[in-house]
Amino acid sequence: MKMEEIIAPVDKELLKAELNEKRFLRDTNHAGNKLYIVDNACAPNVLREIGRLREIAFRAGGGGTGKSADLDEFDLDGAFKYKQLVLWDPDAECIIGGYRYVLCDNVMYDRFGQPIMPSAHLFKFTRRYLKGAFLKTIELSRSFIRPEYQSSEQGMKSLYSLDNLFDGLGGLIVLYKGRMEYFFGKMTIYPSFPEEGLQMLLYFLRKHFGTWENDLMHRLDRMVIPKQPVKIKLTRKFDNILTEKDFREDYKILKREIQKMGVNIPPLVNTYMNLSPTMKSFGAGINDEFGNVIEAGILIKFDELHPEKTRRHLSFPKLFSRRPF
């Protein structure tokens, strides 16, 4: 893939003007950062900087679009109703990271009855799902942390960058409570990740999160289907390695075995797996529009988070105004 030269940084004063009190969501619990919600109509300069930072972050991991900025029609066209959750460092006056999201009861559909959204390129959604949980779901996509905040370079700001983003998700849960009940997202695994490590990780996800004893979600694995599925191989070998029934004990084995391969479990994957005991994983597909990264689809119910995660991300002293955004 030919890589275009990435655009120049957007002037900080333009960003500060658009990330104003009207767009404020909440303060983070740690590191003194702030979270905002914007779209292209109210913050075109912020969107431009997000596109620049996303492309830098994704290229560094082995993915990316190859364009000068990672922005598409879902970012730029208000008809699709996508918003951006923005994590801002008020000290360095820069964007640390973010998420793109949409309320699924707002999405449009194509002539085949499939939702017009980024994840529909990777997954087929059955009618049963679309008429049920889908309508109470927030789709998350394009999560990123700028590279400088992925190491210890920024001290406490780096240490809490991903945690701060999940403070933002906690803010969304509170903001849309009563209307939305689930997060639908994708866990990205880059091509540089060892093949056997990928296989073991997918096996682990299927073993511990492949079924869900919830009436609405029963047999969800038959409701959301990867279009280019990654098949799990070496099953017999993993049967003899990941032998624990308890998630936490089996997770210790997974972590140790992955580290033997010279890598760690990707941070976002690691965080999602420890977010909810009832998280649903329904397989992984190849994203051929994004550097052939592997994307594992997941669904998380708001009121089934681990209690410590609820306390950590949904309890905060400075409550935002309940605006419709």
Segments and roles (model prediction):
Residues 27-73, 83-103:
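Short amphipathic alpha-helix that is part of the acyltransferase structural core
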Residues 39-42, 89-92, 100-106, 142-147, ...:
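Short, flexible loop/turn elements at secondary-structure junctions
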Residues 55, 65, 106-277:
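Acyl-donor binding region in acyl/amide transferases
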Residues 69-75, 285-289:
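Short, solvent-exposed loop/turn elements at beta->coil junctions and helix N-caps
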Residues 75-86, 109, 279-280, 290-296, ...:
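A short helix-loop-beta-strand connector motif used in the catalytic cores of GNAT acetyltransferases and
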Residues 267-274, 279-300:
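Aromatic sugar-binding interfaces of carbohydrate-active proteins
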Residues 291-325:
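C-terminal non-catalytic accessory extensions
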